[in-house]
Amino acid sequence: MRLALGVSYNGQAYQGWQSQLSRQTVQDQLEMALSKLASHRVSTLCAGRTDAGVHGLMQVIHFDTPLDRAPNSWVRGTNALLPRDIAVEWARPVPPEFHCRASALSRRYAYILLESPVRPSIDAGQVGWTFKPLEQVAMQQAASHLLGEHDFSSFRASACQALSPVKMLQRLDISRHGACWRFEFEANAFLHHMIRNIMGCLITVGQGKKPPEWLKEVLLARNRNVAAPTFSAHGLYFLGPRYAPHWGLPDRTPAFDRLP
């Protein structure tokens, strides 16, 4: 049978999602726990790989197993074997044609940014940080230039392995919650470092260093060198994919409520 799992994790201690020789990744920790619980080697696929330091609120994975167990037993059993900063939120049986990556309609991320004269301490690793005040209207005007289908080469990491730089950015919402800003992104897919590179540009505009129209110039240049530096990974959260209703999978977890 094929199982889909929703997984949340704090990415601070890990070298990203994808398995590495060091085995200090979220995928490695999850597969070790699942393999021990299932008493057979479990290999997983995920909806979207995250970099070192990036957090996940609802990463979706799938794997195949000959075992027929109740979904809750997979949740409780796997969590008993996982480190405290990784948790399985839910488990669902899915048809064999379901694929956590290929079946996704879109992917969602949030970036949480603290605006404060003092760097974060209690929230260290959980939020990005800027000590200069930001102008919301200017950032929203700049963000509007990125909506729709574009070549996002200017926001692409040099190591990006995507076959095409053309992506459809469906949503980029900017809101303020006390001392924190929340930037929420939704697209069919994202390039490597795309969100962090966009964040660097939005903050540049928000601080008044560049006008909102500058972001359109950066986009059209299709040249990474004209954009702002890549922003910190600390405040980036993978909110998870969206799927068509017929798959019967959740589109959020209780972890969503803990973000500003």
Swiss-Prot record:
The active site is at D51 (nucleophile). Keywords: Isomerase, tRNA processing. One of its GO terms (molecular function) is RNA binding. It is an enzyme of class 5 (isomerase). One of its GO terms (biological process) is tRNA pseudouridine synthesis. The keyword Ion transport does not apply. Its EC number is 5.4.99.12. It catalyses: uridine(38/39/40) in tRNA = pseudouridine(38/39/40) in tRNA. It comes from the Bacteria. Gene3D superfamilies: Pseudouridine synthase I, catalytic domain, C-terminal subdomain, Pseudouridine synthase I, catalytic domain, N-terminal subdomain. Substrate binds at Y109. Belongs to the tRNA pseudouridine synthase TruA family. PANTHER family: PSEUDOURIDYLATE SYNTHASE, TRNA PSEUDOURIDINE SYNTHASE-LIKE 1. Formation of pseudouridine at positions 38, 39 and 40 in the anticodon stem and loop of transfer RNAs. Homodimer. This is tRNA pseudouridine synthase A. The gene is truA.
